[in-house]
Design a protein with these regions (language model features):
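Conserved two-metal-ion catalytic palm core of "right-hand" nucleic acid polymerases
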Residues: 1-203
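Active-site palm subdomain of RNA-directed nucleic acid polymerases
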Residues: 200-239
């Protein structure tokens, strides 16, 4: 239950909030898994997100979200129980620079392999050493545009997921259900802020990276890496 404990105690609030907002006491939930009443782990109850916009560069704003603690605990428990399967799917891409890493200490429970845009500088330099151009693309409203029903598509393929859409033996269906329950049943978008969303989004984006890699030779273009973060996904292709 270590991942459940860490996601609750150090991955609940958005990182933009000051340190005075602390959820370290929520780690106790991980020790109460078996003692908690069945209603706590309900798979049918829904809750609403608490949302707040913070300014970004220019005129843009980032819509942060704080989920109901019970709904978030359900999602984190699913990630914890199924981490081996999630990790196996994430590892399919050899070019992603955003693979989520769990940390036992520090301010956050989960960080991407390259946590900050500034840390991409050496990677860009390496890409330039073998080519002339870096192609960069920005995915607008990335988290907000993820369709929760597409989470099982990414994990199990769209064909399988549609054939077994009510089969909760599939991890993707359980994650989809937890995400919807956490945001009043809505299927469009996942909350920006909690560390669990980083795990879900990277798992979802993994198929895109694999598809790019499979088609990475188009004429003189060779894809060397994909490094998405919240709201931006630069793709590096030396020509």
């Amino acid at each position: 239950m270590r991942k459940l404990r860490d996601l609750l105690s150090r991955g609940y609030f958005p990182r933009e909030l000051p340190p005075v907002y602390d959820t370290s006491s929520m780690r106790r939930v991980a020790t109460m898994v078996n003692a908690a009443p069945a209603s706590f782990w309900s798979t049918t109850r829904t809750s609403e997100l608490c949302q707040h916009n913070v300014p970004r560069s220019g005129t843009l704003r980032r819509p942060l979200a704080i989920p109901n603690p019970v709904g978030y605990a359900n999602l984190c428990r699913e990630i914890d129980n199924s981490w081996r399967e999630i990790s196996r799917h994430i590892s399919k891409s050899a070019i992603s620079k955003s693979t989520p890493q769990f940390y036992t200490a520090g301010a956050r429970a989960v960080l991407p392999e390259i946590p900050n845009q500034a840390d991409l500088v050496p990677f860009r330099a390496l890409a330039r050493s073998s080519g002339k151009t870096i192609l960069s693309t920005d995915i607008s409203r990335f988290y907000g545009s993820i369709y929760t029903h597409s989470v099982p598509w990414a994990l199990h393929t769209k064909v399988v997921a549609k054939q077994r859409r009510r089969d909760y033996g599939l991890l993707g269906n359980r994650l989809d259900r937890s995400l919807r329950n956490m945001q009043d049943g809505q299927t469009m978008g996942i909350p920006i802020g909690p560390d669990a969303s980083l795990v879900i989004s990277d798992d979802w984006l993994r198929n895109l990276g694999v598809s790019f890699y499979d088609d990475s030779m188009v004429g003189p273009v060779k894809l060397t890496g994909i490094a998405p973060s919240i709201g931006v996904a630069p793709i590096f292709s030396p020509l």
